[in-house]
Structure formats: C-alpha cells, structure tokens
Amino acid sequence: MASEETSLRALESLMSEFFHNVTSNERKREIESLLNNFAQQLGAWRFCFYFLSESHNDYVLMYSLSVFENLINKMWLGVPSQEKMQIRSSLPKLLLSQHKSLPSFICNKLCKVIVDMGRQDWPMFYHDFFTNILQLIQTPSTTPLGLIMLKTASEELACPREDLSVARKEELRKLLLEQVPTVLGLLTGVLESIWDKHSITAATPPPSPTASDTDDLLSNLIHTPNLTKQLSQPPPSLEAESERVCALALECLSHLFSWIPLSASITPSLLTTIFHFARLGCDARSRHTTSVTTNTTSSVVNGGSSSPPLHSAAPTRDRGRLGVLAMSCINELMCKNCVPLEFQEYLLRVCQQTFYLLQRITRETNAHSVRNRLEELDESYVEKFTDFLRLFVSVHLRRIESNAQFPVVEFLSLLFKYTFHQPSHEGYLSCLDIWALFLDYLTNKIRNRLEDREAIIGRYEDALVLLLTEVLNRIQFRFNQTQLEELDDETLDDDQQTEWQRYLRHSLEVVAKIMELLPTHAFSTLFAALQENLEVYLGLQRCLVTNGNDQRLNVTAENDCRRLHCSLRDLSSLLQAVGRLAEYFIGDVFGARFNDALRVVERLVEVTLYGSRIKLYNMETAVPSVLKPDLIDVHAQSLAALQAYSHWLARYYSEVQRQNPEQFISIISTAMEALPPLISSKVQEKLLLSACHLLVSIATTVRPVFLINIPAVQKVFSRITDGSAQRLPEEAQVLLCRALSNVLLLPWPNVPEGEQQWGERSSHHANLLNALTRDYRLLKGSSPPQRKGQLEATKRVICQTLGVLRDVVENISGEGTKSRQTCYQSLHESSQLSLALFPAYIHQSDVTEEMLSFFLALFQGLRVQMGAPFTEQIIQTFLNMFTREQLAESILQEGSAGCHVVEKFLKILQVVVQEPGQAFKPFLPSILSLCMEQLYPIIAERPSPDVKAELFELLFQLLHHNWRYFYRSSVLASVHRDGSDEPMENQAQFIVVMQAFGQSFLQPDIHIFRQNLSYLETLNSKHKLYHKKLFQTVMLPQFVSVLLQVLIHKSHDLLQEEIGIAVYNMASVDFSTFFSAFLPEFLTGCQGLDTSQKSVLARNFKMERDLPSFTQSVHRLVNDLRYYRLCNDSLPPGTVKL
C-alpha cells in the first residue's frame, strides 16, 4: 500500500504544481506527458481506484476518472476479463458508497464512466447494468443517483459516438427501446408520488371579476371535468430535495422524448403529470417569493435513511425551473412531425392542456395585468412557451384545426393577448413569427381550396382585423413611443440591419401577409393612417419662416417638437409599409385594385415633389439632431415607396399607352420634377441615392417613350455631362449614368422596331459616353506618371470611368441585339484605349482589376458586337502579359488585390471557353498550358483558397464545353461504343487536369472540395466521365479510395452525403469489379486492421446496388473501420511511476 500512498501524494503534488499560476508552460507539458504515459499502462486503473477511494483533491479525482474513461473507451478490448469484472464490480460500489460526499461534477463523471462500461458490455458481460439503474431509481435514498445514471445512459447509449460498430449501435438502441415502457412508468411514478404527497387541498378562492370569460374558455379547451379540476388546484410546495428529484426526472424525460418514437408508452397519466409541473412556471408570483415552510420530511426521497429532514421549502425560482423543464418535455413531443394515428388523441390532449396554461398566463386579475404577469415569469419559461406555440402552429395546426374539440378561434384570442403583452422586443418578434406561420398556413389552405375562400376568411376575419390594427399600432410612435425609443437604430447586426429595422421588417411582413388575405380592409386601414400623418407633413409649409436666403422650420415648443418627431417617424414607417404592399396591386388583381393603387401613387408623387420643392431636408430646426434626420428619412422613404410601384406603373403604361395616356404622363413628369434638386453633391447621400434609384427604376422598368423629353430628365442629363460640375459620390454617379444610358438603350415597350428611333438614340448615347469618358480619353498614348500624386489622380480617372462603363454594359447584357450594338458603338474607342493602356498598368493591381472587370463585362455582354478580331487581340494580349512571373507576383503580393486580378482574368477565360463557335478553339491549348503549367504550380500547395475556385471552374467549363477537344467521336458513335472505348486526343492534358481535381480532395478547404466534387458529378451526368476507359482503369480506383479515406478521417464531415453519392456513381460503372476487386484491395491496403477485421468489414458490406443501401453500407464500412482502429491502438511498452 505504501507505493499507492506514495503515488497519491506524488499525483496530488503534480496536480497542484500543474494548476499553480507560476508553473511554466514547458513544465506543464512535462507533467502532462508524464500523466499521459502513466494513464496508458494497463495496471494504472488499480492506482486510480485507490486515488478515487482515498483522495479529496478534485483534480486527482478527475484525472483518475479520465484514466478509467480512456481505459474503457480506447483500451477495453485489451483488458483481461478478470480485471474487467473487478472494475465493473468496484466502480458502482464506489459510487454507491460515496455519491453523497462527492462533488456533483465528480459524481456525474463517475456515472458516465460506469455507463461507458455498459455501452461496451451490456447485456452480455454486464447483464445487471440497466437493472441496477432501475433499482437505484426505485430506492428512495438513491433516486437522484439513479436518475443521473438513467439520463447519462440515454445520452450515451441511444445516440452513441463513432467509437462503436454499427451493429453494436443498433443493438444498444434496440435494448433501450425495450426498456422504454418500464422507464417511463418509473418516471411517472416518481413524479406522481412527489406531486401527490405535497399537494394540499386549498379552499376555493372567490371568483375574480374577470374569471367568467376565462372559465368559459377553459371549459372549451378541456372537455375532461376531472382534468380541469386537477389543473385548477393550487400547486404544491416542494422542499429542495424533492425539487431536485423532479428536475432530474424531467431532464430524463426530455432526453428520452428526443429519440423515442411516439407510442402508447407515453400514457395520459404521464402527460398529465408533466403538465402539473409545467403549471409551476406560469405562477406569476414565483419570481419574487418563496413558498411557505412545510413539515413534511424528505422521507419520500430518502426512505429510511438517516439524512435529516428538510423543512425549508425550495425557493420558487427553482419551482419555475421545473416549469421550464416540463415545457422542454412537451416541446420535444411537439417537434415530432410524424404522429401515428393512435397518438392523435394524445396530441389533442397535449394541446388542450398547454392552452390551459396559456389561458392562465394571459388571465388578467385586479393585481396583475397580462404584461405584468409575463414580466414576472422566468424568461426561459416564456421562451419555451413561445417555442411550443411555434411548433403547434407550424407542425400540428393542420391536424388539430378541424377537430371540433379544439376551438382554434379562441386559441387565436389567447395568442393575441400573449403576443401583444410580451415584455421584451425579442419575445414580441418571436410571436410575430408565429403569426406569420399561421398566415402562411391560411394562405396555402385557401389556394388549395379556392371554393371555400369566403368561409375560411370569414372564420378568421375578426382575428386578422385585430392583428392588423395592433401590429400597425406597434410600429407607430403615436401609440408605442416608450418601447420604440428603446430600439437601437445605429448598430448593424450580421444581416446589416439595425434593431429598429429588424423590428419594422418583421412587422411589415405580417401586414403584407394580411394584405394578401384581406386586401380591401388592410389597404383602407393602412392608407387612413398614412393620410393622417401626411397631413401633418404637408402642413409644415405653413410653419416655414424665411430669413433672406435661409428658411427655418418654426416649430420650437418642446412638446410640439416631440409630437412632430413621432409623426415623422410614423410617416416614414407607414411609407415603407405602403411600399411593401406594392406587389399586391399587380398581376391578376391589377384591374380590381387599380383605383386604390392610383390613389397611393398620386399621393406619393405629391409628397416627393413637395419635399423637393420646399427642401425640408435643408431646413434649420429647433432640434436639428432629431428633426433633420426625420425629415430626410421621410423624403427618402417617399421616393423609395414610389420606386416600389415601378412595376405597377409599367403595367399602367402598357394599358394606356395607345389611348388617353395624359394622366400617366402627368404622374411620371411630376415624379421626375422631384429629382433635379436632389441630384447634387450637397444633398445628403441617403436622399441622393433614393432619387437615383427611383430614376433607374423608371428608366429600366417603366421605360416611357417620352422620358427623355421631360425637362427634369434633361436637367439631369446636363448635370451629369457637365465636366465643370462637382462629381457626385461614386455610387450615385454610377446609378445616374446607368439610368441615363438605359433611357437611350432599352427598347420602348409596345413600340414597333421601326418606331424605336435607334439612330437618334444612338447619337445621344454616343454624346453621353463621350462626355463621361472625356478625361479618360485624354490618357491615349500616355504612360503612367512618375510622381505619386499624379499617378494616383490618373488611376482614379481610370477606375472611376471604367466602373461607370462596366455598369452600363452589365445592365444591357441581357437585352436585344440593337441595344447592345448601340452600346458598343459608343464604347468602341474606350475599349480600344483600355486594351492599349493595360500593359502599362499591369503592375498596378487596383487599375488592372478594374480593367479586367470592364473586359469581363464586355465578354459577357457584348462579345458578338466586339467581333472576332478584337476579342482575339484581347485574349492574346492577356495571355502574353500573364506570364508565370506575373502570375506569381500577383498571387504572392501582400493583400488580396493581386489575387482578385488573377481571378478576374480566369473569369474572362471561363467566358472564352464556353463560347460555342469555333472562333476561340485555337486558344484552348494555350489556356490549358497557362492553367496547368504556369498557374497551378503556384497555387497547388498554398492553403489559401484564393484563385483555386476560379481555376477549377475554368477547368470544368473547359472540359464541359469542349469535350470534343478530348473525345472527337460523334454522339451516335459513342452510343454504339457505350462510351467506354472512344478514341481520345490530348490525353496528357486530360490526365493532368484530372490529377489536379484529385489533388484538391486532399486539401482541407471544404468549399473547393464541394465545388470540385459537383463538377466531377456534372461531367459524369453530361459526358459519362466515369465510364470513359482511361478514367475507369487509371483514375476511378484512386478517386474512390481518396473519397473513402476522406470519410474515414472525418476531414469533410459536412459533405458525407455528397461523397457517398459520388462513390456510388463511380462504383455503379462496374459494381462487379467494385465488390470483387476494389473493395478487397482497398481493405488490404488499410493500416491498423488485422486480417479477421478486414474480412468482417468486407462481409458486412452488402452487395446491394440501389443508392440508399449502397451509401448505408459505405457509412457502415467507414464507421466500423474507425472503430476497429480505435480498438487496435497499441499500448506503449514500459511502466511509468509517478
């Protein structure tokens, strides 16, 4: 024993040293190595058992348990049978004798180690493993311990990790399922006995003034009088130990429900018991008070043990935790979409009982409003309850709605109260998501049963009307100022939205869904609110005071400023709402809802012109930090709302183009009048961009013939082509040039080709681009300036000009031939100049990237218009310039600019190799040479994915669109030959490309892996790649082997399904060869397995040829191979003493 005591003292000393703050990292590594070596010895467990029995040092205890854990999970096969029996006998005894004195985390770890033994040996060698757990639960003094063991067993055995064979996993699951009825019965008994013991009969309280309605509702929800009575009784007071037992039991149930199927084992009695505990969470008083003391002892838990009785009741925040755990159990049941027919009645019972709780939560009393009650509940409980409601609506409403025993309309009434009394913004938005799910359900139901539309809408109309009114009120400061001012409108989240924008977007989505169901009512409600706030805004012109050239808004009183601020914020929100509803006025309902849409559009045009004329956005105000942003936002939102109606305006134009277009012309002309004052570098960018976007939409979507003749649009033309005018911000400049170019390039709708006036428009467009490229064309024949300042100025001219031109090209790339011809005629000189300047700026990454982006747009949109000679000249120039040295310089330089240059170049080549004609075919050898000889060696071993994605896409497109470069035979010939023995050309290049794809599967980057795997699959489906003789004989075994190794090493686990399908497609080329030759050869080459294990793996791989069975066999092979390797890990020789 001396050696054990000495070792214990040494271990305690080492542990203290390891965790001491002055111990160096080097010394820690030495200690760690020593401890690891000690743990690897087969006899180490004896010392560790002594440490567990004798030590009180938590570090020592955890280390000792980790040694057992390692022994059981990684070395168990090598442990002699006699020692296994000793361990299986000793550890449970140790747990039983010391569980009350051990810290909880040590006790939990010891339970886990014992369960790990059960995972390995139950039932063959550890036949009483589960029986012992059940006995622990049934013995009052060890009930908590038994429940911890049960939960751990559920976690570790039902869904075990990959350190077990598939057969063992299936066996464990089957064994556990056999125990489920017994376990659920036991848990029901534990919970019921504690509940019944602590329940007290309370005197019936007098009815509250608000009780009658809710009692009627309760009787509607629950049709079982006894159950209603039970649920209405006051909850019992539980002492701390009973709380703990109940919490453990509910945790067990929650985990069991996560994996067991719905069945009769989940009895009505169990469900009722769970709901008893769920009630504890909706006791509004539980956040701030504790239960009265009780004289009951803990004998129900402790049995005849000598533990002293616990007289103090547990704090009710712990009772609230029981409510949270009970709701977790209910939600685990609710999230199961597959509900057996025999469980439908149980499902109804679950819903009825939960909505009893909802009724309790939303009941108003003299002492508590609904909001106060929700504020006093545990936040976690409210979250769980909201989760339940979401699951009910999204998964089960379709099952329950038609059941006469479930009053859906009354449920919606409760949900309404629950939603609009949420104490937090997050809680409210979560509830809005539930309403959105309900509205989607209703919309889909109506689409599938159009003949019942009126009946369905009629049933829910009152609820929808109330919902719309309240949601609109909630986004208005007039009704909800206190809460709305809490929302952050500055910090952006991951979706680039502020908290306020997210709140508004959620709300408007609900409004839009109601609009689809109740269009007339929704529109009238919204438009009335909009009109009310517009009157305030339009009336501001009466409050203007002029002082010389300056104007001031004469609203100075603090209360008036506050009211104006609220009204402007509300107007901004309502304008966004009106814009969001634009889609509900087009399509089949255009005619029916025309008058409503016309009212909106005319009002929006009036507002935008008003804002631009009196320039409220430039006014001096009493509170400039508040009111000025409000005025700017209203003006910007009015422009954005009008832009949202551009598709409606396009439809309106097509209806009146040939007859009585005067009203339409007036609308467009008036709207355009609002723009020129805003097209200025002095105007706030938010407002400027809104004006630009509106012009783009009118020019691109509506395309009126008369747009170019409107004086306001001609003013914008003059502003943008005036070389002396101050340049606008970059984004605004690009948008305006796009709009003006589209005015001239896009064909007018419903106008014959002969009346499109292309000649005149072409001349105007040439003048426009000449003006925009004036400074750029002055660079012709020049070389880059030597002085840094001049060079930067020149680069700025190049980048700004090419950015505008690229945008112009991209926006007409999908248009007809005439538009593209006209565009290229205007661009021809700039294109030639760009190619001439390219070599001079090859070392300026930012300029080169912009030039390549421009040429990429030309190739994608105007390839035909450029003509073969010029395109060939461009390609040849690029191929000459991008030497291996230049590519290396670009890729290896600091930052990502150089990589972007190469990626843009590869994108251009992608367009080239996809060209169907023969014009660019002569470039294929040069492109392949550049890719595989110059570029690939530079990036192959770089861990960074930069450039790789574009390179492999280029190689894929080259193969896909130029298959006959490698396989020249006709389609008919390849069919007759079955594709496997076609004559091949350029074989060496093909092999090099395939090797590059294969090499990419050995790289860690998952995106490249997924991309390239999909490319191979596409080449197989389109060109039978896997069937080609060269691939089949030389490459296919290597690819399958690599993919299987990837699965075995778990390096790309997210792609398990895709890899399995790819292996199947490769194997299906010749299943016989795969089963008889490849699989045995693959297993023979696998390291770390003995011969018998390889035979078992081969035997277990079922020779079935359908995809599901085959991929299941693949994943079984991978799992079991990993398991065998784990079992075979050899132990290091020698003994290490502490």
From Swiss-Prot:
Pfam families found in the cross-reference section: IBN_N, Xpo1
One Gene Ontology biological process: protein export from nucleus
Broad class of the protein's primary localization: nucleus
Compartments reported by the entry: Nucleus; Cytoplasm
Annotated Gene3D superfamilies: Leucine-rich Repeat Variant
Cellular component aspect of the GO annotation: cytoplasm; nucleus
Protein name: Exportin-6-B
Organism, as annotated: Xenopus laevis
Protein's gene: xpo6-b
